[in-house]
């Protein structure tokens, strides 16, 4: 019989995979027939993580028991102590409905188990009838029973019952996910149906709002909250504390997910042979029991999921159009055959990503890194005087970091040619965590922040004595966004501590936690880069499924040893996992609890882990420290190779670094947020515009950003159009207007009539932000002289033109746009006739070759708003002077 336990439902939502569900529903014999064994893929130490979750549950159960009156909470305990839990586990209660029949039910029931009615939904009933599904029993963590009339929405006929039952699911995670929300909704739906079947419908109703009891770094938070309400004289302090602690799950949202599972997915998967169930290997598969099996199958059949960043929906669209392998995708995109044309007619995203996907596919075939044609990145600088590399590893359950690493490469001012850079590297290990208390993390964060801030302060201090042209730049590199988010979470968690706030002041300005408004100047300076996103943008690598750090580093122009073999970044068994950029967090639990499962791999017994020697605690500590160091080295290698091999594609320009507070920090308090919001909005728009313009022209068109394929309309056809416009709009009589036909595939561009922040350039023009004089290779004074001779620069007020960007010279206004014509066309007028003619004369644009229109960004508002709000007045907040570090 097929088995459907509550873990299968929750994990199906986590992995979103039909094959996973089919394998979980299969019998052992069915799985064995395919050579699938979930136990083969278990990670050593994973039981510690499960035990930590159960321990947190048990602690919260005990909190509820200890703060409630005797007899108000029904529970049972096992007879023996569980060594991993450090206590007797709670035992399931099997007589739930007998308890509910009591004249006065308890306030809470812990781990009450009941059978899910087969008629929960018609689909589930059909699964039982047609496929012999095993009867399912579920066990919500806590049933909280309250007198009716709380105002909570109820499942059922809406009448107020004598009692309401609220489902509570205890989770160690501070931020519950979709799987948690669907799980608690499933419990609520199942219990509501079971209560009706038991004939309790008139007395009990189940709350439609299931709840999550989330994790907290203060293990006594609930007990303290109960005491607070007791001190306030609350009639029911326990219920008040629960109401404040719990996260409510909107039933109407997640009911749809649960019912769709039973009505559609479950039946569809049960009707499918195991080998035919749909699947797609991606980053979310990291902890799936069957991931190795699927990766092997993907390699055997050249599965489309081998392409990093291709999602399952896109892969299914490709397959529906006859493209089933990465090799076929390469052929289809390269030849632009009918299959690919059909795909891009259905998906603008695939149209935009086509060249990158084809490059990734070719790289897999050829086994070498390949650049994506035409792409550039405005997210990473080609050079910085100081480069800081950061890696952070954490436990996603508790949210606590267990390893932080920072390294720097610094070229000081005044160094001589050939002088080596200053290098430094620091590793910080959180070696003790008791009951989710982040105190040790706080101490390591203070050490980490002190080191990185001192590196930044050193450059900033040097720059105060240098002229602008000689000031040193500084930039911070992370591998992926997870590390940045974790850094911000640590700041958020500890910033109220007086010992921490001054130490992290500089870093929070550049990487503010969610509760702080970003500093606009720091934000605009783009202080850091997510290197993985740069690789995604620029390079195809021979790495399947996802660009993990080590796989990327080992395939991206690796260093070569003296014997000619490539150097590999590698870690011992247990310190790295496929498709993950984090040190396995089981190692942290082993270190924190002194219960070590990981063993040294033994070449003499490669398939018998029982003969491998366990790590000692010191060896484990050193192993985590070494793993953190290797992560830093791999990150540095990738950045170095990007700069060596693709320097011309890295277009972010960095100015001299300053750690000084921005002027916005001295603005009156009432105006500060308004000014910051406006400046942040402007900075976001400017960066988005610059990043999009760094894409190849076909991608810009596919994102509806640009109008491409512009060619001058024959004069005989253009003249009547121009005459009609000038007749209807006399203000254009003295102007020179141009009429261009453009590509029909650009009809849906967001550029509209009346837009005047638009530049026209040849399709091979790469950088509209480059000053025209630098492009022509002339200095400021020579450029000024040339403009003076042309009558373009007549006074000091015109000197801005000397340093104008190419985009400014090529700025035009859209006078008319006829996108729906059989041959679409656009009519434009120069923004500045003199500058435009100057650009034509100096071959900055050739109207005889194919052209493209790109939106520009100019900030017209932030300066005015800043001035107006400063004029309103008010006292600025006092500036705290950071004390000197020793």
Language-model features: locations:
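Conserved DEDDh/DEDDy metal-dependent 3′-5′ exonuclease domain
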Residues: 120-129, 139-146, 161-265, 425-586
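Long, compositionally biased intrinsically disordered regions
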Residues: 335, 339, 344-357, 583-708, ...
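Metal-dependent nuclease catalytic cores that hydrolyze phosphodiester bonds in DNA/RNA
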Residues: 1-157
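C-terminal extensions
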Residues: 278-280, 294-449, 665, 672, ...
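Acidic, Mg2+-coordinating catalytic module of metal-dependent nucleases/exonucleases
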Residues: 227-230, 235-301, 312, 540, ...
């Amino acid at each position: 019989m097929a088995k459907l336990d509550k873990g299968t439902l929750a994990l199906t939502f986590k992995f979103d995979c039909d094959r996973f569900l089919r394998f979980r529903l299969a019998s052992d014999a069915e799985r064995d027939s395919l050579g699938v064994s979930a136990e083969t893929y278990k990670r050593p130490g994973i039981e510690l993580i499960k035990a930590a979750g159960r321990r947190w549950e048990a602690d919260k159960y005990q909190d509820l028991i200890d703060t409630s009156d005797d007899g108000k909470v029904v529970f049972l305990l096992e007879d023996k102590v569980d060594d991993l839990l450090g206590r007797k586990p709670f035992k399931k209660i099997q007589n739930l409905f007998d308890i509910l029949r009591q004249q006065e039910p308890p306030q809470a029931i812990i781990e009450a188990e009941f059978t899910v009615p087969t008629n929960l939904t018609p689909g589930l009933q059909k699964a039982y009838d047609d496929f012999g599904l095993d009867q399912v029993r579920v066990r919500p963590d806590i049933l909280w029973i309250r007198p009716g009339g709380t105002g909570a929405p109820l499942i059922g006929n809406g009448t107020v019952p004598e009692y309401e039952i609220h489902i509570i699911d205890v989770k160690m995670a501070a931020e519950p996910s979709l799987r948690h929300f669907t799980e608690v909704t499933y419990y609520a739906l199942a219990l509501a149906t079971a209560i009706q079947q038991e004939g309790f419908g008139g007395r009990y109703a189940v709350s439609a709002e299931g709840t999550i009891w989330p994790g907290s770094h203060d293990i006594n938070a609930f007990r303290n909250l109960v005491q607070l309400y007791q001190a306030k004289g609350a009639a029911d302090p326990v219920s008040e504390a629960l109401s404040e602690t719990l996260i409510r799950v909107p039933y109407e949202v997640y009911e749809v997910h649960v019912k769709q599972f039973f009505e559609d997915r479950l039946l569809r998967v049960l009707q499918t042979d195991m080998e035919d169930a749909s699947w797609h290997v991606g980053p979310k598969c990291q902890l799936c029991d069957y991931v190795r099996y699927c990766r092997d199958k993907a390699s055997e059949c050249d599965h489309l999921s081998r392409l990093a960043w291709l999602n399952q929906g896109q892969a299914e669209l490709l397959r529906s159009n006859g493209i089933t392998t990465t090799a076929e995708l390469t052929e289809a995109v390269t030849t632009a055959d009918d299959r690919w044309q059909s795909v891009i007619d259905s998906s603008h995203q695939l149209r935009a990503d086509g060249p990158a996907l084809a490059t990734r596919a070719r790289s897999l075939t050829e086994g070498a890194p390949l650049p994506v044609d035409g792409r550039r990145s405005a997210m990473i600088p080609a050079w910085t005087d100081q480069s800081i590399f950061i890696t952070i590893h954490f436990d996603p359950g508790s949210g606590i970091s267990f390893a932080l690493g920072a390294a720097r490469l610094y070229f000081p001012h005044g160094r001589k040619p050939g002088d080596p850079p200053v290098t430094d590297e620091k590793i910080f290990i959180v070696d003790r965590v008791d009951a989710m208390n982040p105190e040790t993390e706080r101490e390591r964060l203070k050490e980490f922040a002190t080191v990185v801030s001192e590196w930044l302060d050193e450059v900033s201090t040097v720059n105060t004595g240098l002229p602008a042209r000689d000031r040193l730049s500084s930039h911070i590199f992370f591998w992926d966004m997870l590390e940045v988010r974790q850094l911000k979470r640590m700041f958020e968690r500890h910033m109220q501590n007086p010992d921490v706030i001054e130490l992290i002041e500089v870093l929070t300005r550049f990487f503010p936690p969610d509760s702080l408004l970003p500093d606009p100047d720091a934000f605009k300076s783009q202080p850091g880069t997510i290197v993985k996103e740069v690789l995604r943008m620029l390079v195809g690598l021979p790495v399947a499924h996802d660009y993990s750090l080590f796989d990327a580093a080992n395939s991206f122009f690796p260093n070569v040893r003296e014997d000619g073999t490539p150097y590999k970044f590698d870690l011992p068994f247990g310190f790295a996992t496929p498709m993950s950029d984090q040190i396995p967090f089981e190692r942290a639990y082993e270190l924190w609890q002194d219960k070590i499962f990981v063993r040294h791999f033994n070449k003499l017994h490669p398939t018998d882990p029982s003969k491998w020697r366990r790590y000692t605690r010191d060896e484990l500590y050193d192993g985590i420290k070494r793993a953190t160091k290797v992560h830093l080295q791999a990150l540095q290698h990738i950045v170095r190779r990007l700069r060596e091999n693709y320097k011309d594609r890295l277009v972010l320009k960095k100015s001299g670094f300053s750690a000084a507070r921005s002027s916005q920090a001295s603005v009156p308090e009432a105006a500060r947020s308004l000014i910051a919001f406006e400046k942040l909005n402007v900075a976001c728009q400017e960066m988005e515009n610059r990043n999009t313009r760094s894409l190849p022209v076909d991608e810009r068109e596919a994102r509806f950003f640009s109008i491409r394929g512009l060619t001058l309309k024959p004069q005989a056809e253009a003249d009547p159009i121009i005459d009609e416009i000038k007749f209807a709009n006399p203000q254009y009589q003295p102007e020179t207007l141009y009429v261009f036909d453009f590509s029909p595939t650009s009809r849906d561009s967001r550029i509209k009539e009346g837009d005047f922040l638009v530049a026209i350039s040849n399709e091979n023009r790469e950088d509209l932000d480059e000053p025209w004089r630098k492009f022509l290779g002339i200095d400021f004074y020579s450029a000024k002289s040339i403009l003076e001779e042309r009558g373009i620069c007549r006074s000091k007020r015109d000197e801005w033109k000397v340093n104008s960007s190419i985009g400014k010279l090529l700025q035009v206004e859209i006078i008319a746009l006829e996108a729906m014509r059989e041959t679409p066309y656009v009519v434009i007028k120069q923004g500045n006739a003199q500058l435009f003619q100057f650009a034509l004369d100096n071959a900055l644009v050739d109207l005889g070759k194919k052209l493209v229109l790109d939106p520009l960004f100019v900030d017209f508002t932030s300066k005015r708003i800043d001035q107006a709000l400063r004029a309103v007045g008010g006292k600025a907040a006092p500036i705290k002077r950071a004390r000197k570090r020793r």
